[in-house]
């Protein structure tokens, strides 16, 4: 897939090539775990971010960093140039899954729930609208309707995979298996 290019309008602001599927809480003191929700079209962070960052820069100003969970996306570069600026992409295994944090250069930040790209449109819309309600304080798992049992199973599987990889095993991740060798 070829990345979509952002463009500048006459006022020198960045205009997304494709409008991101995004809902944000109104700008106010933080309430709840997330500041809104984003439903990307793919699991390729470097393809999805330019349009999202163009929209979020209206609220955050110049974007400095994006933090994400390593296992949630195909391998991403450490830096991404978008709109003529370089943004650091920092992947962590401890970053809460199904979230990204977008940090502005001035220290402002937004934590977004990431609705998996394969989610049914009706369910994704409902989840995004709920996450963007001003006083919604639901957890990420609550918003995505992930039970504690399911989360425990996913955590156990992820821990086992990380242990296997740290001992020299190759990853079983289907996203990593798709990358050219």
Labelled PLM ranges:
Residues 1-4, 9-14, 59, 174-181:
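Short linear motifs embedded in intrinsically disordered, proline/glycine-rich low-complexity segments
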């Amino acid at each position: 897939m070829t990345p979509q290019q952002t463009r500048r309008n006459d006022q020198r602001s960045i205009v997304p090539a494709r409008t991101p599927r995004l809902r944000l809480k109104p700008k106010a003191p933080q309430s709840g775990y997330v500041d809104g929700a984003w439903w990307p079209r793919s699991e390729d962070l470097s393809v999805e971010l330019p349009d999202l960052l163009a929209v979020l820069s209206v609220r955050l100003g110049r974007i400095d960093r994006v933090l994400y969970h390593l296992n949630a996306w195909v391998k991403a570069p450490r830096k991404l140039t978008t709109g003529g600026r370089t943004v650091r992409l920092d992947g962590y295994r401890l970053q809460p899954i199904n979230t990204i944090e977008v940090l502005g250069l001035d220290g402002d930040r937004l934590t977004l729930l990431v609705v998996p790209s394969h989610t049914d449109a009706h369910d994704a819309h409902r989840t995004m609208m709920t996450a963007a309600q001003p006083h919604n304080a639901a957890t990420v798992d609550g918003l995505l309707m992930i039970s504690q049992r399911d989360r425990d199973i996913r955590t156990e599987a992820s821990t086992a995979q990380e242990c296997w990889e740290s001992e020299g095993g190759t990853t079983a991740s289907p996203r990593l298996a798709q990358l050219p060798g």
